[in-house]
């Protein structure tokens, strides 16, 4: 029986790297896992529909546009999930937890979709503040944010 796991964290906490290592290990052990990287899917979908999102500017977009793109991505995931759950041993939906941008906390997921997906596990990655700060200060989109 396949498990649905939602993974989350703040930027700079290395969750994507950990999930990539998990994927490598799963392959070595003969397990199939699927990882939906919601952030990348949002960038891909925005380009598909002609919205100029990039990792550097997405948080500057109007919240209604961000929410619409995120909803479209979650609709796609929800539509694929029945088949995906039959094909893989575990399915991960990887999404940011929250953003702190221009002195405002911005939500990174929609509670409606999280509750509709009914995950078996909700996993939050954490890291220490200094490590996260050091990682973010070298990324272009975070250099101006203090």
What are these regions (language model features)?
Residues 1-5:
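Pre-Walker A (Motif I) flank of P-loop NTPase domains
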Residues 6-22:
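Glycine-rich phosphate-binding P-loop
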Residues 14, 43-44, 130-133:
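Short, charged/polar "capping" segments at the starts of alpha-helices
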Residues 22-26, 77-85, 136:
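Hydrophobic, Leu/Ile/Phe/Ala-enriched alpha-helical segments that form helix-helix packing faces
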Residues 24-34:
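Post-Walker A helix-loop "phosphate-sensing" segment adjacent to the P-loop in P-loop NTPases
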Residues 34-106:
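ATP-dependent small-molecule kinase phosphotransfer cores
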Residues 95-141:
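ATP-dependent NMP and nucleoside kinases share a basic, alpha-helical "lid"
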Residues 143-146:
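Short, intrinsically disordered, charge-balanced linker/junction segments flanking boundaries
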């Amino acid at each position: 029986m396949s498990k649905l796991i939602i993974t989350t964290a703040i930027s700079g906490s290395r969750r994507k790297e950990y999930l990539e290592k998990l994927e490598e290990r799963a392959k070595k052990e003969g397990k199939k896992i699927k990882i939906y990287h919601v952030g990348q899917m949002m960038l891909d979908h925005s380009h598909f529909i002609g919205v100029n999102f990039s990792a550097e500017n997405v948080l500057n977009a109007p919240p209604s546009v961000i929410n619409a793109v995120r909803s479209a991505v979650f609709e796609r995931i929800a539509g694929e999930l029945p088949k995906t759950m039959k094909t893989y041993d575990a399915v991960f939906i990887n999404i940011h937890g929250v953003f702190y941008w221009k002195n405002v906390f911005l939500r990174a997921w929609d509670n409606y979709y999280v509750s509709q997906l009914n995950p078996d596990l909700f996993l939050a990655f954490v890291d220490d503040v200094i490590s996260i700060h050091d990682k973010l200060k070298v990324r272009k989109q975070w250099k101006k944010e203090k």
